[in-house]
Amino acid sequence: PTLGVCFGHQAIAQALGGRVERVDTWGIGNRPARISRRESWMTPGHDKVGIFYCHHDQVLDLPTGGRVVATADHCPVAALAVGDHMLGVQAHPEFDPHYADVLYRGRYTGTHPEALLDDALSTLDDPLHRIDVATWMLRFIRGC
């Protein structure tokens, strides 16, 4: 099995013929991703999950044989799967609110528009499903 997170998600897509490009805005903050295709390993089940993002590039076209598993307003391919052996997730389930706060302040203060940082920081206390998403990843790997 192969699991890609953030850049790894993008690398899987590009290596298999998908298209990855830099987009106009950064994807940062705890953003909801809608589950567009329920997979057997996605338990506990959710229709959408809140999860932290930190990216400027993203998958725009799926690789050959790929399918969209989740989508977000700012990121149409928030998660993808290829067959039953590859999973890519643009978001960061390893980020908790404290880590995201420190990272965003350290990386974006003074280098990016203040409104971008303020918006991301305003999402720190939004509903978060990082443990459930990490559980899905483990279930995916174990099922391969």
Q: Predicted regions span which residues?
A:
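Amide-donor transfer/coupling interface in amidating biosynthetic enzymes
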Residues: 21, 36-144
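Cysteine-nucleophile active-site neighborhood
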Residues: 1-39, 50
